[in-house]
């Protein structure tokens, strides 16, 4: 025998839970299915366990999509300040870390508990270990538009909301099911790829593994001209850190990125001044004042930099060194992939989704929210804000039916 819920949400992540809470609050019956044992698994892992739940500065310019105007309506309707107010009302204390990033003081569990208590309070049902294996569309029936096979039970609904997320962090249950639903109904999917993700070394750069654990502030620039100033971290696999994760959104395979290792210094000026004041100084002495000692020593060991008395260094060699430090061209072998990626770029094509309601323009009652869509935010709470804003737009639209 079939079970019925007017609204069914697939996925108990940030977007799915928030949409369920809002729908229930607006008086709609809603059931959430998730294939995992726990709700909000990615929320719990995010921000080092403290959940960077939004940012003080949220604009459409912080998002990438094939349809760059798509995010405007939802972000304007439910803003970062709306979510900050909700968090404050619930008594959750938070702090700004850097660049407007807001984190919970006491841990990401607080956000998950808040979403769950909102669902419980208004009667939204959450069913875990519930694998949706099949979705069918019913024609000419306003009440039942979709039939789902969930484990061994058939469920029917009027509205189906796909909040399945992307492919990043497969260890937390990520699957391509949301994309498969879209394709089943003829909705195009922009090819997904790992994003906000570390770069890996090519064979020729493997010597840099000796720097694992060292970080420094850099300016990193993609071929398209986009640049970020933040920390770069050397790892045993490649380069990571906020600067690298941010630029990975703008990097294309086979391209190089340009890295300024001393964006706050004019190396040429500092060497020339040292030539005047202390011409017998060794080059290494100057460089270790500016850069991590281990990095300078590795350059000397590899023959990239020659340690000598600075008075003997020609203008041409100074210029070559300066170019290397301020314009290091790094060509990644690739990225670490979905295993460590924070988000997935690409997804359900927003050109065929209503930016006001998140409903498919082709299939009535079929909605897509959150990361499953072709919307990728910068690092720093922007992807969570997209989850809240897109979920709210969807819930508000359904509540007015």
UniProtKB/Swiss-Prot annotation:
Keywords attached to this entry = FAD, Flavoprotein, NAD, Oxidoreductase, rRNA processing
Signal peptide position in this chain?
Answer: none
EC number(s) on file: 1.3.1.-
Identify which cofactors the protein needs according to its UniProt entry.
FAD
Does the keyword field hold NAD?
A: yes
Q: Which SUPFAM superfamilies match?
A: FAD/NAD(P)-binding domain (SSF51905), HI0933 insert domain-like (SSF160996)
Q: What class of enzyme is it?
A: oxidoreductase
- Which branch of life, at top level? Bacteria
Q: Which reaction does it catalyse?
A: a 5,6-dihydrouridine in mRNA + NAD(+) = a uridine in mRNA + NADH + H(+)
Q: Which Pfam families match?
A: HI0933_like, HI0933_like_1st
Q: Where does FAD bind?
A: 15, 34-35, 41, 47, 52, 132, 371, 384
Q: Which PANTHER family match?
A: OS12G0638800 PROTEIN
> What is this protein for, i.e. what is its function?
Catalyzes the synthesis of 5,6-dihydrouridine (D) at position 2449 in 23S rRNA.
Q: Which family does it belong to?
A: Belongs to the BaiN/RdsA family. RdsA subfamily.
- Protein name, entry field: Ribosomal RNA dihydrouridine synthase
Q: Which organism is it from?
A: Haemophilus influenzae (strain ATCC 51907 / DSM 11121 / KW20 / Rd)
The upper taxonomy is: Bacteria, Pseudomonadati, Pseudomonadota, Gammaproteobacteria, Pasteurellales
The gene name on file is rdsA
């Amino acid at each position: 025998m079939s079970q019925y819920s007017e609204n069914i949400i697939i996925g108990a992540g940030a977007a799915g839970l928030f949409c369920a809470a809002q729908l229930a609050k607006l008086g709609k019956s809603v059931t959430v299915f998730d294939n995992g044992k726990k709700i909000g698994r990615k929320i719990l892992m995010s921000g080092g366990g403290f959940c960077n739940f939004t940012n003080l500065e949220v604009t459409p310019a912080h998002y990438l999509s094939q349809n760059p105007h798509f995010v405007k309506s939802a972000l304007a309707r439910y803003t970062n300040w709306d979510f900050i107010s909700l968090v404050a009302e619930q008594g959750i204390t938070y702090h700004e870390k850097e660049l407007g990033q807001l984190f919970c003081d006491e841990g990401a569990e607080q956000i998950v508990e808040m979403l769950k208590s909102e669902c419980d309070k208004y009667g939204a049902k959450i069913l875990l270990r519930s694998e949706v294996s099949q979705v069918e569309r019913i024609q000419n029936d306003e009440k039942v538009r979709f039939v789902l096979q969930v484990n061994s039970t058939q469920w029917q609904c009027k509205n189906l909301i796909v909040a399945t997320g992307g492919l990043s962090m497969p260890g937390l249950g990520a699957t391509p099911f949301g994309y498969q639903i879209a394709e089943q109904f003829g909705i195009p999917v922009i090819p997904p790829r790992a994003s906000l993700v570390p770069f890996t070394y090519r064979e020729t750069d493997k010597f840099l593994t000796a720097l694992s654990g060292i970080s420094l502030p850099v300016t990193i620039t993609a071929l398209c001209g986009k640049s970020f100033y933040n920390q770069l971290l050397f790892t045993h696999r490649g380069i990571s850190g906020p600067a690298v994760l941010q630029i990975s959104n703008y990097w294309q395979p086979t391209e190089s990125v340009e890295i300024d290792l001393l964006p706050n210094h004019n190396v040429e000026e500092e060497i020339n001044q040292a030539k005047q004041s202390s011409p017998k100084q060794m080059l290494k002495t100057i460089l270790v004042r500016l850069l991590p000692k281990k990095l300078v020593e590795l350059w000397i060991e590899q023959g990239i930099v020659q340690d000598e008395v600075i008075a003997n260094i020609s203008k041409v060699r100074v210029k070559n060194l300066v170019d290397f430090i301020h314009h290091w061209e790094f060509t990644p072998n690739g990225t670490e992939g979905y295993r460590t990626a924070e988000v997935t770029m690409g997804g359900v094509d927003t050109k065929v989704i209503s930016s006001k309601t998140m409903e498919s323009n082709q299939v009535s009652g079929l909605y897509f929210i959150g990361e499953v869509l072709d919307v990728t935010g910068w690092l720093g709470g922007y992807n969570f804000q997209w989850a809240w804003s897109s979920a709210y737009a969807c819930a508000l639209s359904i509540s007015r039916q």
